[in-house]
Amino acid sequence: MTTNYIFVTGGVVSSLGKGIAAASLAAILEARGLNVTIMKLDPYINVDPGTMSPIQHGEVFVTEDGAETDLDLGHYERFIRTKMTRRNNFTTGRIYSDVLRKERRGDYLGATVQVIPHITNAIKERVLAGGEGHDVVLVEIGGTVGDIESLPFLEAIRQMAVEIGREHTLFMHLTLVPYMAAAGEVKTKPTQHSVKELLSIGIQPDILICRSDRAVPANERAKIALFCNVPEKAVISLKDVDSIYKIPGLLKSQGLDDYICKRFSLTCPEANLAEWEQVIYEEANPAGEVTIGMVGKYIELPDAYKSVIEALKHGGLKNRVTVNIKLIDSQDVETRGVEILKDLDAILIPGGFGYRGVEGKIATARYARENNIPYLGICLGMQVALIEFARNVAGMENANSTEFVPDCKYPVVALITEWRDEDGNVEVRSEKSDLGGTMRLGAQQCQLDDESLVRQLYGEPTITERHRHRYEVNNMLLKPIEAAGLRVAGRSGDDQLVEIIEVPNHPWFVACQFHPEFTSTPRDGHPLFAGFVKAASEYQKRQAK
């Protein structure tokens, strides 16, 4: 089986939406029956985004096999059925780390280690390994053409096109076509210069995706085709849309998938986008709306909670309601009080790290519990709910997590010091361990209590969800908390760790240690988010009476 590669680059400016465009194209190709995957190559020197600030980089998306990756992999999984793995994302830092390790080991037999061929070869090896077993692999190169950091990646994909053959490789370039209001027309010059930059590296794009706030007229696309040496039918207009889930249909309507299949000599049926049309219909025809407050510490950059925001929207689709998300800084709860939480139909506290704003989250959990407002806590959101319950119901005054107060009297949340990794090896950690790559990561089994709400929502006794955390419920202090009325609704497969808690005498109060947002998709949704949004709708109706 021959694997075909589509290399996706971006020019003129960053944040054009390469990830969404690549994922949308992959969705169309998948709908044609092709086995598709997507890779993201990030030019930064961090080994992975695990220790990067969410305010700078956005969320860290965790794959099933426990890799901490770029948020674009979340888009990929929401658009196609293929599950991403650690093979689907790597950085300059990872490549250099691998090459330097080999050099120290003597693998290069005394050769002078250079960017070409050693770094470029390492990049090519990883791309080829990630593409094994697939009909089509889309490879997104992070950053913008012209960035010094991207050069080794661009050189590597240039070489791959020569080595694999142009009949099995395509270069797809996203570029900005700005509209100039004063002139009353779109301008193609930035695109021409961007392609010129690519040509100087030795890459002739085969497809141009023209990003604009409006449809690019046919005459302007013809002009771009002429000056950039690309067939007219391969110049695609990609205008701004009110829903990213419309993009597969937009690309298909311009024949992009037909062009690619013809170039790769692939014989496959027409794409059936009925599932995406259903998503668009549900999104455009809600029967109501709810307002959900998300209380966190990184709210100045919504991308820090990208998967949570998308999962809430998916929950809305499953209930035919529009979900309005109100982002609330947990420090504002500390300074202004819980008054700012009024007029919400439900409250969600997502994951996070560090002490800043934690007391505001604890106050938020208490407000939701005492006022019967639907509550969903994720990761840290579960831990603050547990701390709040321990303090205010179980009588454990000043209960806390050792992450925030190491010597507190009631450490109801504590560091996980030992667990097994995906290979079955025992991992041991302490407070002095490195921050990078030292968490409980990836898919883990969870056994659900038969009497629990989550058992009803999931409809099965055992589930698998993804984790990213260092701290867990302290089993030594669990009994008095359970005696006070808290239900442990889910435990790890080995019965050692608390994964889900509920407040039984509350209409809907669920908190989980894992990250359900990572497995929610627009077509399938997720049981927790669907149930949470439904609870928000029911709360709204009760309040209206």
Swiss-Prot record:
According to the UniProt entry, its GO molecular function terms are: ATP binding; CTP synthase activity; glutaminase activity; identical protein binding; metal ion binding
Q: Which Pfam families match?
A: CTP_synth_N, GATase
Q: How is its activity regulated?
A: Allosterically activated by GTP, when glutamine is the substrate; GTP has no effect on the reaction when ammonia is the substrate. The allosteric effector GTP functions by stabilizing the protein conformation that binds the tetrahedral intermediate(s) formed during glutamine hydrolysis. Inhibited by the product CTP, via allosteric rather than competitive inhibition.
- Binding of UTP occurs at 14, 187-192, 223
The reaction(s) catalysed by this protein are: UTP + L-glutamine + ATP + H2O = CTP + L-glutamate + ADP + phosphate + 2 H(+); L-glutamine + H2O = L-glutamate + NH4(+); UTP + NH4(+) + ATP = CTP + ADP + phosphate + 2 H(+)
InterPro entries named among the record's database cross-references: Class_I_gatase-like (IPR029062), CTP_synthase (IPR004468), CTP_synthase_N (IPR017456), GATASE (IPR017926), GATase1_CTP_Synthase (IPR033828), P-loop_NTPase (IPR027417)
Give the annotated active site.
Answer: 379, 515, 517
Provide the function of this protein. Answer: Catalyzes the ATP-dependent amination of UTP to CTP with either L-glutamine or ammonia as the source of nitrogen. Regulates intracellular CTP levels through interactions with the four ribonucleotide triphosphates.
Name the chain's protein.
Answer: CTP synthase
Please report the organism this UniProt entry assigns to the protein. Klebsiella pneumoniae (strain 342)
- GN (gene name): pyrG
